[in-house]
A protein has these predicted regions:
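Peripheral docking tails and interdomain loops at the edges
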Residues: 2-9, 383-424
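Acidic beta-strand-to-loop metal/phosphate-binding motif
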Residues: 134-142, 364-373
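Redox- and metal-dependent alpha/beta enzyme cores, enriched for Fe-S-associated oxidoreductases
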Residues: 66, 78, 83-96, 104-105, ...
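Acidic/His-rich segments in extracytoplasmic proteins that coordinate ligands and/or metal ions
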Residues: 122-187
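Short, acidic/turn-prone active-site loops that include or flank metal/cofactor-
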Residues: 95-101, 164-169, 307-311, 402-403
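A short, acidic, amphipathic alpha-helical segment used as a generic capping/interface helix at domain edges
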Residues: 124, 346-363, 380-381
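A charged, amphipathic alpha-helical module
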Residues: 2-70, 182, 186-315, 348
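An N-terminal, globular interaction/scaffold subdomain
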Residues: 54, 62, 69-125
C-alpha cells in the first residue's frame, strides 16, 4: 500500500483515529472477497481500489483540485452527476457505511437515527473520511427526514446544497424536478465558474449513459443460470462506482462484463448447480457494509440482484440524448431520475413492478427485504412489498439490521432457515 499519511495530514484528517479504522479493513476484505474461489480476474482492479480506498481516489481528486476543478460530494442517486460533469466538476460519494463512524454521529444525532445517517455525520465530524475533507460542496436531497436534518449540521463548515425531490410522480412533479435540476445547474456554474452548454451537457449525459450500460452488462450476466460472479463482488463493483472516475468505471465494468460473458459461454460458475438465487432489496449498502451479502453467500445461496440504490436503481434507465436545448435536456434528466423508485415516494407501485420484473429476469428463488434500523421508509414499505411478492408466489424474508456485528449470528440463523425452506 502506498503511503498517504502526508496527504491525510494536509487535508486535516485525524490520522491516529483513521489508522484505527484502517486496521480492520485488510481482514474484512480478505474474509469477504479474497477468500472466494474462482473469482473473475477482472476483479483485481476493485481489489486494488478497496485496499487503498482512502488513498488512490482521494489523491486523484486533490490533483484535479490543483488544476482548478471543484469536487461535489453526494449522498443519493437522485443527484444528477451529468450536471456537475458538464461544468467540468467532479462527483464523489461520501463515507457512510461503517459502524466505526456511528458513535461520533450519535454525539450530535438521536440514537434512533438510521446508521447510514449517523455514520455520514460521524465520518465528517471525526475527520476520518478523506472524501468529506476534500469536497468543495456537499449536495443533498430531500429523500429522508434524517438526512434533511443532518445536512444542517454538515453544512456548518462546508457549503451545502439541498435539492428538493418531489414526493409524488405526477406530471407536475416531473416538471418541478426539472426546475430543481435547472436551479442546481446554476449553483454548479457558480461554484465551478464554468458555463453549462448544450454540447457539454450532451457529452456528460452520454458519458454517464455509457457507464450505466456497462454496469447493466455485468448485471445481465447474473441472469444466466450459469452464475459467473458472486453477489459480493458485484456489490463491491457498484459501491466503488459512486467514487470512481466515470470513464474508467465504464472501461473496467466493460472489461469485467467481457470476462463474465466468456465464463458463461464456457460454463464457468462460482456456485454449484441448484444453488438458490436471492434478490436483495431495501436500504442502500455503502462501503464497507458487506454483512448481509457475506452471510447469504456463506449460507449456501447466491445473491443475483440488488433492487436498491447500491444496485439497479443506480444504473437502470438511460437519459434521452436527443435534447437540443438545455430546457429539453433538463427535462430528459428529470424523466430519467424520476423513474428511480425510492421509498420516499407515495404511492410507490413502481418499486413493486420492478421487483416482480426482476424476479423473473434474474430467475430468483427468494427475496430478502432488508432495512437499516430506524429507516422508517423502507421498514414501512416492507408490508406492501411482502404482500405483493407472496401474492405472486415468491418467498420473501424481511430483515432489519444495522452496521454492528452483534446480530450476525441471528441473521445467519434466519437466513439459513430461509435458504433451507427454498430447498424444501
Amino acid at each position: 500500500m502506498a503511503d498517504y499519511v502526508e496527504m491525510w495530514k494536509n487535508i486535516g484528517m485525524d490520522v491516529d483515529m483513521h489508522d484505527t479504522l484502517c486496521q480492520v479493513l485488510p481482514t474484512a476484505v480478505g474474509d469477504v472477497f479474497l477468500s472466494q474461489e474462482n473469482r473473475p480476474k477482472a476483479m483485481d482492479f476493485w481489489d486494488l481500489v478497496i485496499s487503498e480506498v482512502h488513498g488512490i481516489r482521494p489523491a486523484e481528486l486533490i490533483e484535479e483540485q490543483k488544476k482548478g476543478r471543484k469536487v461535489f460530494g453526494t449522498f443519493c442517486v437522485y443527484v444528477p452527476d451529468e450536471v456537475v460533469i458538464a461544468a467540468n466538476g467532479i462527483v464523489t460519494g461520501l463515507c457512510s457505511g461503517s459502524q466505526f463512524w456511528v458513535p461520533a454521529g450519535e454525539a450530535v444525532l438521536p440514537k434512533s437515527t438510521c446508521p447510514l445517517v449517523k455514520a455520514s455525520v460521524g465520518a465528517r465530524l471525526s475527520r476520518t473520511c478523506p472524501f468529506f475533507r476534500i469536497a468543495d460542496m456537499y449536495v443533498g436531497e430531500t429523500t429522508c427526514d434524517g438526512k434533511k436534518k443532518a445536512y444542517e449540521i454538515l453544512g456548518e463548515d462546508v457549503p451545502m446544497y439541498v435539492m428538493d425531490v418531489p414526493q409524488m410522480k405526477r406530471a407536475e412533479d416531473i416538471a418541478r424536478w426539472k426546475d430543481e435540476i435547472a436551479a442546481f445547474a446554476k449553483k454548479v456554474e457558480e461554484v465551478t465558474g464554468n458555463r453549462i452548454t448544450v454540447e457539454k451537457l450532451k457529452e456528460a449525459i452520454h458519458l454517464i449513459n455509457e457507464k450505466r450500460k456497462a454496469i447493466q452488462r455485468v448485471y445481465d450476466c447474473r441472469k444466466s443460470e450459469c452464475l459467473p460472479i458472486s453477489g459480493r463482488d458485484v456489490l463491491l463493483m457498484i459501491q466503488i462506482a459512486f467514487f470512481d472516475d466515470p470513464a474508467r468505471c465504464t472501461q473496467m465494468c466493460n472489461r469485467l462484463a467481457d470476462e463474465l460473458e466468456e465464463r458463461i459461454r464456457n460454463g464457468v460458475s462460482v456456485v454449484p448447480k441448484g444453488t438458490k438465487r436471492i434478490l436483495v432489496t431495501g436500504s442502500p449498502m455503502s462501503i464497507p457494509n458487506w454483512k448481509l451479502h457475506q452471510i447469504i453467500e456463506t449460507s449456501g445461496a447466491a445473491v443475483v440482484c440488488e433492487e436498491m440504490c447500491t444496485g439497479t436503481r443506480y444504473f437502470e434507465n438511460l437519459v434521452d440524448e436527443g435534447g437540443k436545448t438545455l430546457e429539453e435536456q433538463f427535462m430528459a434528466l428529470s424523466e430519467r431520475y424520476m423513474k428511480t423508485n425510492c421509498a420516499c415516494f407515495t404511492p410507490n407501485k413502481g418499486r413493486i413492478d420492478d421487483l416482480l420484473r426482476m424476479v423473473k429476469e434474474y430467475k430468483v428463488d427468494g427475496v430478502i427485504d432488508t432495512s437499516l434500523k430506524f429507516c422508517c421508509l423502507y421498514d414501512t414499505e416492507k408490508y406492501v412489498v411482502s404482500r405483493a411478492l407472496k401474492e405472486a408466489g415468491v418467498p420473501v424474508l424481511s430483515l432489519e439490521t444495522d452496521y454492528a456485528d452483534t446480530d450476525a449470528e441471528q441473521l445467519r440463523t434466519r437466513i439459513g432457515a430461509f435458504v433451507e425452506m427454498l430447498h424444501a
